Amino acid sequence: MRQSLIYNSIEVIAYNLNRQNNSLKLFELGKIYGKHNNKYLEERRLCISIVGEVFQMNWNIQQSPDTFFYGKGLIIDLFETFGYNNLKFNNVDHPDFVFACEISSQNIILGYYGLVSMKKREKYNIEKEIYLADINWSRFIENCFTKPTYFKDLPKFPSIKRDFALL
């Protein structure tokens, strides 16, 4: 029984890096187990990890964006899709990260995001930076869609754009 998805994610990243897959965007959804105040806990967690270049270089993309902010944007998009609009990232100390942000909404801690510490990466001989998000999926699902979702009918006719040139 595992207590965190972080170590398994780092192991998968090491496996892929050893096989020359240098740019990775991975996720894992699973259960973790633990004990808190003489009670046994079982929680679902979502672990998102990003390593290497975010986009492949081509004529249109000269420089890849900063991986930290790409991951933060990915997390914000995920949360907004499920109805979280007032998301906060607060800097905290976390034993698994060099620097970490606590992801919270309405004073409910939903997870952590940051750069995995060198100590954790050295165990698997990984030199590249690993940005990882550990989201408490059980808590995430309980609190999503607090507002009702509204849908609009699709248009019956396709949109028409006209360009008039008058002389």
Region locations from a protein language model:
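Extended beta-strand-rich architecture
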Residues: 1-167
